[in-house]
Amino acid sequence: MSHHPQGIVTNECTMKDVKDMSKEELLGLLEDASKNWLAHDGLWFRAVENRYGIDAAMDLDRNAWEKFTVIEAKRIMKRLGIEPGGGIPALIQCLKFRLYAHINVQEVSEVSNSRCVFRMNKCRVQEARKRQGLPDFPCKSVGIVEYSLFAKTIDPRFKTKCLVCPPDPHPDDVWCAWEFTLSA
């Protein structure tokens, strides 16, 4: 134990500033922050669902995602120095920096100058529900808002098509898949 000038007694091995953390510790912190964000999102949703029902919860969730996905895309673009209109390369880069990317397993394939397919191979929310014996969460209507507005924020020319997303039947190794196409 030591006494700091402010009179705070600390155990030196537990006091640390973010700026002093190693790369591995910072990546762990980012993963924890992503998990915390998702836990809050889930708890908020369940609270609304319990009080007002699933339809109201889904409606409010869509409304929140309409705003959040744009904020997230803009912040990622600013952090990476990406200007709007960057097409497929900008979208692929930004998808890697979403909060989901730190806690889910995802991939981008079928990449061309005008099209790509994004797949969520492991989804923390859906896999938790599966472990609890619950049915797939029907997130398609929210996902359509989330992914289409995320892509349009990066490049307004994007058209987004849902290839599969619960409640749709899906393969065991893909929870959802989205096709992004640049229109002329």
Go through each PLM region and give its residues:
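Long, well-ordered alpha-helical scaffolding segments within enzyme catalytic domains
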Residues: 143-147
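N-terminal accessory segment detector
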Residues: 2-117, 122-142, 152-175, 183-184
